[in-house]
Amino acid sequence: MKYAKIDASTVGSNTIVAAVAGKRILVLVYSFMGSGNQNAYFCSDATAITGTLYLNNHIRSTAAYGATTPAGAVGLFRTEIGEALNLVLSTTANVGGHLTYLVTD
């Protein structure tokens, strides 16, 4: 298993895990919080691999502006071969957290 911090604040794509040649990035669990109302989703390079996560105070989450998942051995989502794992943000606001992942074939 490998671990990555989520430290993003730019509108658009923010690289969380760099691409690994010939490999996929399989996300097992994640947790993050934002400093304001915004939307976020994970991408394999530029292709969305999750639905939109609405980081606002109208959803039930670990914090008023956060998203989290339970740990699982089968994985939640993965990138395409040789592509980076990115987090896309809809507004400029600080987002921080962490994720656990595997590098697979």
Predicted features, each with a name:
Residues 1-105:
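Beta-strand-centric surfaces of beta-sandwich/beta-rich domains
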